[in-house]
C-alpha cells in the first residue's frame, strides 16, 4: 500500500492563483498528493532493529530507576532504626565476616611430597613442585627448604654440600638462625654425610630426626619437621655397598597450618620495625634480626670521625646472589666509625630477590644489574657497570670506595681511608689505596699503623680516583667476550703504568666467603682464614708521608742498611731460619733473574705459609712483612735495584718446586 504525504495549502494573503503558482514553484513536478515508492526489505529490517534497540534502552533505564528507588528506600529504613555507633559496629562485623571467609578459603594443611635420590631431589606442596634439582654434577649434599607455617609459602632454600669440609657447620648455623615454628624440609641428593660431623648430627637429632646418627655414605634421606615442635615424617634408604647409592626415598606427609596471627611477631610500630616486618614475614635464616622478643638492631649509631675526609665518598658494594654474606657484610660496614648510609649503594649482579630484600632491610639503595657475559667475564662486567653507575649517581664525587659482599669491614675502615685519601691527591705515582694486604697473615703482620707500597693491585676494599676510572680504565675495560679477571687486568703493566697501591700491614677487611666462582671451603681455609684483621676502633696511621714515592725509597734503603742478613745456608722452611728476636730488621736475598722470575719466591712463600699461587705484594722485586716480631725484607737478586746492598759473601737462596708436595 503506497505511503501518501498530503501537502496543506497555505493561502494566507495570497489568492488562489498565487497559491497554486507558489506550489508549482516549490514542487514543479508534484501534484497536491505525493506518492512514495514501497520500502525495500533491508530498509524494513533496519527500522525494526532500531526500534528494538530503543525498547531495550528504555527497559534498562526503567530497571536502573527501580533499583535506585529501592536502594534509597532501604537506606532510609536503616537510618530510622540505627543509633550513633551502630554503623561502625556494622562495618567491623562485616570486616570480621570477610576475614572469616578468607580464612575458610585458605587450606588448613599442606600435603608435602619429598624425593631424595642419587640423581634428583624434589619437593612438592599440594601438587605444585617448588624444588627440583636434577642437574648433573650439581646440587650435591643436603637441600633445606623452609616454609611459612601459616601460608606454606617458601621462605628459604639452601643447599649444603656436606661432602665438603665445613658445610655441615654452615648448615648448623643456618638451622639455628631459622625461627621456631617454621616448617623445614630436608632431602639428600647424591651424597650428604662424608664431612657431616657429630655436632651437626646432634642438631638434626634435636630437631626430631631418628636417623641422624646412622645416615652414612651415599644413603638417601628425607625429613619434614616443625622447628621446635613435631617431626612429621622421616624416610631413609641405606647404601648396600661402597660403590652404590641407597634406593630413592619418597616421603609424603600432611602438615597442619597455624593461624596467621600465630606466625608473626608483635613488634611496636616504627620505620625500623616496618622494614623488619616486611623482611621477616617472607624470608628466613637471619636469626636475631627476626626475634620476636629481642630483635637485633637495624639502625646503627657508630662514632663520627674527626675531620672525616670520606663522608661524601660513595661506597659501591659489589654483590651477587649470596644474601647471607651481604647481610653479614652490611652489619659490619654500617657499624664502622664514620659510616654514612646515604652514600652506600648495593649493586646486585642479576635480578635476585633476597639480596635486594637484605639491602632494603637496612634502608639502603639497591640496584640490580642485568648480567653480561659468563663466569669471570660476567664478574668483570658487573664491576664495570657498578663503577660507571656509582659515578653517574654521584656526579660530583672525585673518589669511590669499592668493597665486596664477602668481606667484613674493620671498625676503623672509614677512618683508614679518611687518613690516607690525601695520598691520591698529593702523589701521582699512587694507583689506589687498598684495605687489604695479600701477605698480611696472623704471623706476618702486626703493626696496624704501618703502610706499604706495592706494585700489585690487591682489591678487597679499595679507594679509586674518579679521574683514573673515567680517563683510563672505563674505555679500556675488558669486553664481555674476554674471560679475564678484572683485578688481574688492572695489574697489567700497560694498565698500571708504573703506579703503585698503598696497603696496610694489618688488613682492614677480612675475607669470610667460602663459596663463589673462584672460591671453596678448602681455598678459604688455606689462604684466607688466618689473615690478620684489625679490630681496634681508633688507629692513627703513622708517618703517612713515608709512603710517598721518594720518601719510601729512603725508608727502604735505611731499613736495608741497618738490617741483619739471615743465615743463607739454612732453608727458609726451617723453623729456626728466622731468629726469635723482636724489634729487629732481617734481610733475605733470593734468586730472581728477571722481573718475571718468581720461581724461588713462590717456594719461599710456601715455606712461610703465605700466598703462593702467584706473586703479589712486592715493591721493586722486594717483599716486606713481619716475622716473629721483627721486620722482614726479601730481596730478589739481581733483578731488584736493592740487590746492590747484598754483601759479596752472601749467595742468594735458590729454590725449585718439589713435584707432588705442597707445603702449607
Where are the model-predicted features located?
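Short, low-complexity, Lys/Arg-enriched N-terminal segments of secretory-pathway carbohydrate enzymes
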Residues: 1-46
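Short acidic-hydrophobic catalytic motif
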Residues: 8, 37-183, 188-277
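C-terminal catalytic/acceptor-binding lobe
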Residues: 58, 265-297, 327, 479-664
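A conserved hydrophobic helix/loop-capping motif in glycosyltransferases and polysaccharide synthases
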Residues: 314-322, 336
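Short, acidic, metal-binding catalytic loop of nucleotide-sugar glycosyltransferases
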Residues: 331-343
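Active-site-proximal specificity loops/subdomain of glycosyltransferases
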Residues: 347-399
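Short beta-strand-to-loop acidic/aromatic patch adjacent to the donor-nucleotide binding site
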Residues: 396-408
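Conserved catalytic core of nucleotide-sugar-dependent glycosyltransferases
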Residues: 410-488
Amino acid at each position: 500500500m503506497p505511503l501518501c504525504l498530503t501537502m496543506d495549502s497555505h493561502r494566507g494573503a495570497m489568492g488562489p492563483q498565487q497559491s497554486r503558482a507558489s506550489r508549482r514553484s516549490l514542487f514543479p513536478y508534484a501534484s497536491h498528493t505525493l506518492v512514495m515508492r514501497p520500502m525495500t526489505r533491508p530498509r524494513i529490517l533496519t527500522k525494526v532493529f532500531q526500534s528494538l534497540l530503543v525498547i531495550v534502552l528504555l527497559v534498562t533505564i526503567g530497571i536502573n530507576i527501580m533499583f535506585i528507588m529501592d536502594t534509597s528506600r532501604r537506606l532510609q529504613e536503616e537510618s530510622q532504626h540505627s543509633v550513633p555507633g551502630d554503623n561502625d559496629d556494622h562495618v567491623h562485623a562485616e570486616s570480621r565476616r570477610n576475614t572469616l571467609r578468607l580464612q575458610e578459603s585458605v587450606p588448613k594443611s599442606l600435603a608435602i611430597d619429598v624425593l631424595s635420590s642419587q640423581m634428583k631431589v624434589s619437593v612438592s606442596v599440594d601438587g605444585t613442585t617448588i624444588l627440583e634439582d636434577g642437574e648433573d654434577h650439581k646440587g650435591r649434599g643436603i637441600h633445606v627448604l623452609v616454609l611459612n607455617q601459616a601460608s606454606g609459602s617458601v621462605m628459604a632454600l639452601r643447599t649444603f654440600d656436606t661432602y665438603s669440609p665445613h658445610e655441615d657447620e654452615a648448615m648448623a648455623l643456618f638451622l639455628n638462625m631459622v625461627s621456631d615454628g617454621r616448617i623445614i624440609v630436608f632431602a639428600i641428593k647424591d651424597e650428604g654425610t662424608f664431612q657431616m660431623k657429630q655436632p651437626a648430627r646432634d642438631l638434626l637429632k634435636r630437631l626430631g630426626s631418628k636417623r641422624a646418627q646412622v645416615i652414612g655414605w651415599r644413603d638417601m634421606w628425607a625429613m619434614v619437621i616443625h622447628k621446635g615442635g613435631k617431626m612429621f615424617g622421616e624416610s631413609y634408604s641405606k647404601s648396600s655397598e661402597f660403590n652404590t647409592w641407597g634406593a630413592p626415598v619418597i616421603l609424603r606427609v600432611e602438615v597442619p597450618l597455624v593461624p596467621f596471627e600465630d606466625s608473626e611477631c608483635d613488634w611496636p610500630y616504627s620505620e625500623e620495625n616496618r622494614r623488619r616486618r616486611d623482611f621477616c614475614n617472607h624470608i628466613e635464616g637471619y636469626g636475631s634480626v627476626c626475634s620476636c622478643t629481642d630483635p637485633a638492631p637495624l639502625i646503627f649509631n657508630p662514632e663520627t670521625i674527626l675531620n672525616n675526609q670520606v663522608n661524601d665518598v660513595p661506597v659501591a658494594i659489589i654483590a651477587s646472589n649470596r644474601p647471607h654474606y651481604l647481610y653479614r657484610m652490611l652489619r659490619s660496614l654500617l657499624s664502622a666509625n664514620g659510616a654514612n648510609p646515604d652514600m652506600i649503594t648495593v649493586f646486585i649482579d642479576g635480578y635476585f630477590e633476597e639480596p635486594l630484600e637484605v639491602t632494603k632491610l637496612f634502608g639502603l639503595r639497591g640496584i640490580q644489574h642485568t648480567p653480561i657475559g659468563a663466569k669471570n667475564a660476567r664478574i668483570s662486567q658487573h664491576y664495570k657497570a657498578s663503577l660507571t653507575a656509582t659515578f653517574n649517581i654521584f656526579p660530583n664525587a672525585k673518589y669511590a670506595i669499592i668493597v665486596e659482599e664477602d668481606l667484613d669491614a674493620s671498625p676503623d675502615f672509614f677512618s683508614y681511608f679518611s687518613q690516607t685519601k690525601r695520598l691520591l691527591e698529593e702523589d701521582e705515582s699512587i694507583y689506589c689505596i687498598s684495605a687489604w694486604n695479600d701477605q698480611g697473615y696472623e704471623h706476618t703482620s702486626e703493626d696496624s699503623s704501618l703502610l706499604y707500597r706495592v706494585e700489585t693491585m690487591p682489591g678487597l676494599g679499595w679507594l679509586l680516583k674518579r679521574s683514573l676510572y673515567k680517563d683510563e680504565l672505563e674505555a679500556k675495560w675488558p669486553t664481555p667476550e674476554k674471560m679475564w679477571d678484572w683485578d688481574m687486568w688492572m695489574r697489567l703493566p700497560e694498565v698500571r703504568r708504573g703506579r703503585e697501591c698503598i696497603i696496610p700491614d694489618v688488613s682492614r677487611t677480612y675475607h669470610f666467603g667460602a663459596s663463589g666462582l673462584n672460591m671453596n671451603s678448602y681455598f678459604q681455609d688455606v689462604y684466607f682464614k688466618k689473615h690478620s684483621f684489625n679490630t681496634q676502633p681508633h688507629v692513627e696511621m703513622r708517618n703517612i708521608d713515608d709512603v710517598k714515592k721518594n720518601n719510601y725509597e729512603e725508608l727502604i734503603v735505611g731499613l736495608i742498611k741497618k738490617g741483619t742478613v739471615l743465615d743463607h745456608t739454612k732453608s727458609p722452611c726451617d723453623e729456626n731460619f728466622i731468629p726469635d728476636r723482636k724489634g729487629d730488621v732481617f734481610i733475605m736475598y733470593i734468586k730472581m733473574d728477571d722481573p718475571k722470575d718468581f720461581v724461588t719466591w713462590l717456594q719461599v712463600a710456601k715455606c712461610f705459609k703465605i700466598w703462593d699461587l702467584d706473586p703479589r705484594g712486592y715493591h721493586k722485586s722486594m717483599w716486606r712483612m713481619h716475622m716473629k716480631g721483627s721486620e722482614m725484607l726479601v730481596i730478589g737478586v739481581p733483578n731488584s735495584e736493592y740487590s746492590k746492598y747484598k754483601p759479596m759473601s752472601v749467595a742468594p737462596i735458590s729454590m725449585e718446586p718439589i713435584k707432588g708436595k705442597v707445603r702449607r
